[in-house]
Amino acid sequence: MRYANRIACCVSLLFFCLLVGPATQSPVCAQTAAAAQVPAVQPVAPANISVRASENAIDESVASDPSVEAVIAPYSAKVKELNAPIGRLVGGLKKGGMGGGSLGNFVADALRSRAEVVLKKPVLLAVINSSGLRKNQIAEGDISSSDIYELLPFENALVTLELSGEQLRRFLNLTVEHRNAQSGARIVYRTNKELKKSELVNVKLRDAGGAEIEIDPAATYTIVTIDYLVKRGGDYSVLQEGKNLRPLSLTMRDAVLEYVKAETAAGRPIKAMLDGRFRYDRTAQAQESEEEQP
């Protein structure tokens, strides 16, 4: 639209200059007239093109080209490997709701489990952004590497860092606000009608023995998350306030793949469910599970 207006303006100026004549041209008219002296584009006759087509069916009777087969062979092998079953999924997984649903629980649990293997000690909490889960569901049955690649297409890496109890509560409030997935906490939240967003009401962690513990604002807690959230800044700048940031040299995708393979090797099927790690607070009413949240 900008260029159309500019052309219309130039044409109007040129027409005005032609009317008033060369003797009375203003500098603008003279410039416009000079600019208008552009060689005209000569029309070109359309070329005559003759096309001849024939149908040639290609089926099993046509031998494969060895040179083409040699090029695609490595890729075919990789695709076959990606589609091969690496575990058995019970119940299926679905994304949605607070915490990314059962799919979010599955990924967060997997990251926490593999982080414990790398660190060789219990991990209190793992948090990831549910928006990074790019597959809405995985059906019950065989689960393959390609399912995990589709679910986690990004190269987000696991990191561990230390937060004070006060910083951790702020981070978990963001976790609720953004409906992110987590493993290790029991969270109660509510809707702030004035701000039109979810907010943290109460949270408890589990110690190495499985007992629930309150967050001490003055204590230090080691958590696992992903580099994307640490680098993001903005609301997540609380993570940049943490200490002893350490990369685990493991991507989210590889962590989940390793988790599935390890569970399968141990004879355990892959499963995750809505287990009440997020509970909605209805004020005077009893707290309800995430299946019943609005």
Stretches found by the model and what they are:
Residues 1-6:
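N-terminal secretory signal peptides that target proteins for export/translocation
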Residues 12, 24, 70, 288-292:
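Disulfide-bonded cysteine motifs in exported proteins
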Residues 20, 86, 90-91, 98, ...:
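Feature targets compositionally biased, intrinsically disordered low-complexity regions
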Residues 21-35:
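Signal peptide processing junction and immediate N-terminal pro/mature segment
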Residues 32-60, 101, 105-294:
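Feature captures C-terminal
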Residues 62-90:
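N-terminal, Lys/Arg- and Ser/Thr-rich interaction peptides
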Residues 80-98, 236-242:
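Acidic/histidine-rich, surface-exposed loop or edge segments in extracytoplasmic proteins
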